[in-house]
Regions:
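Glycine-rich, highly charged phosphate/nucleotide-binding loops
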Residues: 2-14
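Internal gly/pro-rich beta-alpha loop/helix module
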Residues: 3, 189, 193, 206-209, ...
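Short beta-strand elements of ligand-binding domains
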Residues: 3-6, 47-50, 208-211
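Phosphate-binding loop of NTP-binding sites
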Residues: 12, 16, 25, 29-202, ...
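Basic, alpha-helical nucleic-acid-binding regions used in initiation and control of genome expression
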Residues: 20
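Short polar/acidic secondary-structure junctions
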Residues: 138, 213-214
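Short, surface-exposed charged micro-motifs
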Residues: 219-221
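A short, charged helix-loop
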Residues: 237-241
Length: 241
């Protein structure tokens, strides 16, 4: 193994015959841009810990048929609390669960430990930071939530738009989106409906939550009745029969 100190430059990749480049989430995309560009030009795969985790799950699915539910959580504030509570709720529901990611321990350490002990869980609950999400392209959770987006880490991302874009990668292309309808930056992550010939436009599967009463079936909100505050969910019409 060769260690290199100093600035990142294209020569670290060009002509090196590398199989892949793996980046630490602590390195901003601007600092390592020459390396990432060189990797793209040379066709060298670039990834990070989350990408390796995705690869590992894909390999386990092929080899063992292992297909756990993956719940992913991010947001500027509150993600550690929500991750911890989600893990506890799933455990109390009788499911085996692993909680990992930004909350600690790391994704790969947790996966390795479960492989060693032959205790692969039914559900993964992942706390993911914008740093981890910035580098991922093929992450497809079962469901994911962005709790909120407020100004933070602009020294790393450069702009609020780039920061929000990194957060939005948590949803992948197919997973259920769980959105904070009180936060315009989060709601802006919902894709526009897809027009389909002779059919209604198709809306990406999603539910929302907020501090007001929910109006859309499946959404969650808050209702105050006789001085008591309740968490409520709007029902489908046939659920009330």
């Amino acid at each position: 193994m060769r260690f290199v100190a100093g600035d990142f430059y294209a020569g670290l990749v060009e002509g090196q015959h590398l199989d892949a480049v793996y980046r630490s989430p602590g390195l901003s995309p601007y600092a390592i841009a020459p390396v990432l560009v060189a990797a793209h030009v040379t066709g060298t795969r670039a990834s990070g810990e989350l990408g390796l985790y995705v690869q590992a799950l894909d390999a386990l699915r092929t080899a063992r048929g292992y297909a756990p539910a993956v719940l992913a959580i991010t947001g500027t504030n509150g993600k550690t609390t929500v991750t911890s509570l989600t893990g506890q709720l799933i455990e109390h529901a009788g499911k085996s669960v692993a909680v990992a990611g930004n909350i600690g321990p790391t994704l790969l350490d947790t996966l390795s430990a479960h492989l060693d002990s032959n205790t692969l869980p039914e559900v993964w609950v992942l706390e993911l930071s914008s740093f981890q999400l910035d580098a991922v392209n093929a992450f497809e959770p079962t469901a994911a939530v962005v709790l909120n987006v407020t100004q933070d880490h602009l020294d790393w991302h450069g702009t609020m738009a780039a920061y929000a874009a990194a957060k939005s990668r948590i949803f992948g292309q197919h997973g259920l989106m769980v959105l904070n309808r009180d936060d315009p930056a989060v709601m802006a992550m919902l894709p526009e409906p897809v027009k389909v010939k002779l059919q209604r436009p198709q809306v990406r599967a999603h539910i929302t939550f907020g501090t007001d009463m929910p109006q859309r079936p499946g959404d969650f909100g808050i209702e105050e009745v006789n001085g008591m505050v309740w968490l409520v969910r709007a029902l489908e019409a046939d659920e009330t029969r």
